Amino acid sequence: MMATALQRLGRKRAVVLHGREGLDEAGLGDSTDMMVVGQEPHTLDPQTWGLTPAPVTALAGGDVGENAAILQNVLQGRGTSAQRDVVALNSGIALWTAERVDNIGAGIALAQDILASGAAWDKLQALIRLSRVQGETN
C-alpha cells in the first residue's frame, strides 16, 4: 500500500521495508520484506551479503546517554558487530535507493568502509559545528 502511494506520488525509486522481527527497517535476525516502487516484492536475507545473523535483542539500547554512546561507537567504526552490521545494511539499502551505488551489496560495502574509517563520525561532527554556527547567527 505504501509503495503504491509512493509510486502515485511520482517517486522514481522508493523502498518500503518490514523486518520480519517486527522492525520498520532491515534486521539481522530474520528476512526483511522489501517493496520497491514499480517492482515485485523482494525478500532480503542479510546473510546474502556476509552479515552475521543477530537477534533484535543484540540491538537494544538504553537511556539517552547509552544510546548516544552506541551511536558514537558505531559511527567511529566501533560498537558491536550487530550494531555495525545493521547500520551498514540499512545504509546500503538507502545508498542504493538514492542511486549512489548500483546494488545493495555495493551500498553495504561502501557503508562499512565509511563506518570503519570514522568518516561518518567526522560528518556528524561537521554537521554539529555547522548547526551551532547557524544557531549563533540567528
Which residues make up each language-model segment?
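Glycine-rich anion-binding loops and their surrounding alpha/beta cores
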Residues: M1-N138
